[in-house]
Amino acid sequence: MRVLFYVSILVIIASVHTQLISVHVIFRHGARAPVLNVTSEEAKSYFYRGLGQLTDEGFEQARLMGKVLRDRYVNSFVDARMLSSQLLFRSSPVERCLMTLQTVGNTMFPNATPPVQTVAKPDDFLLVPKLDCDFQLGEWDNYFNLTESDKKMARKNPWFVSDKALRKAVTKTDFLQDRGGENLPALILEKEAGLAVPSWFNEGAYKESLHVFYSALAVMSSVGEYKSSKGIRIKSGLLMEKVFNDIQEKVRCHEKKEVSNIKCDIHKLQVFSSHDLLILPILETLGIREEVLGKDMPPEFMSTIIIETMIVDNSPVVKVLFRKNPREITLRDVTGFVKNCPPGQPLCPVQRFTSCCNEFITSDPKSECYAETTVEKQSEWVMTPLSWIIVAIAILLLIALILMTYFVIRYKNRSIVNIKKLSLEN
């Protein structure tokens, strides 16, 4: 009887037809050097590629990510020969992101590395979070009561505000009370790399510094206590709209495929390499930030969000996976925690998933970010050389018209006078 029960279970499982139709992978770059400065000669030697550059550990993390993706998708989902039509590899133009994605791609397809696409930083609203939007200064002013001098500094360098958030967070700590002026982001990376750090930067100070560093990121990414729907839209809204549209398009394609036998393989695996300032608002958008990162914690290097779309018994559904630690090879299923999805369930209907977060998506972040500037530019009158020529011609024509009118009136008046004289003489 028990054998019959297990056999029936296996029959039911086997009868469920599942087809993976699209995958979106979004990750933070691998381990890097501090961006602004290091705190010792030892650190300077260790981070030999320079500030902000990928480290040897970062390359290893990228290779492991490539292995995870290769084992999960290459052969079983995409062609192992690397057909570029099936893939979209897109990176932020920042070198550490480009190198991370290139390494991931090379590990997935060792015989033919996928082409990596990118866009210049000022024009990239997909993977480069914008920090210079007009409205953000107003939001920051509400948080920190900025002086006019502060506002000038923030316009010149938005990270000035991040430092304010960091110093504010330091005042709430136990170990870091008098350390607001220290280079905490660099010390975090140096300690994680196993380098010597000051004695005061013990384990307690290190753990507190992670929360402090999160606060510095939160204000720039518009999440947590600094949550702003508009701020999130500007940073991750275009990418999330693309993901939702891609999913819906793939579902429509496969519905048509049933009757017309069309191909639906174009860009069915998309991989994006970006920054912590993009990962945070995406997690906030999906409603899973605290669940996957912990309370007030920053994303680790190579933090990865994977969205799989599949057809299960003719129903389009989504599975959301997360990889927190750069050394992990397992993926955590977090579908049941995603906003608008059935709680605790391993699959989420596509319709519910793609309608989860309308307040956080946008098709035109540029106009939302620079709305006032755009209006001002449109209303400005710019005098080009051609404009001056046209104005000069118009003035000459006006003068000529006035003179012609004057002479016509004068001639007409003379004619009337002559007629009157003739009438009197006759």
Curated annotation (Swiss-Prot):
Transmembrane parts of this sequence: 389-409
Keywords carried by this UniProt record: Disulfide bond, Glycoprotein, Hydrolase, Membrane, Signal, Transmembrane, Transmembrane helix
PROSITE patterns linked to this entry: HIS_ACID_PHOSPHAT_1
SUPFAM superfamilies tied to this protein: Phosphoglycerate mutase-like
Protein name: Putative acid phosphatase 1
Gene that encodes it: acp-1
Cytoplasmic side: 410-426
Protein family per UniProt: Belongs to the histidine acid phosphatase family.
UniProt lineage: Eukaryota, Metazoa, Ecdysozoa, Nematoda, Chromadorea
Native organism: Caenorhabditis elegans
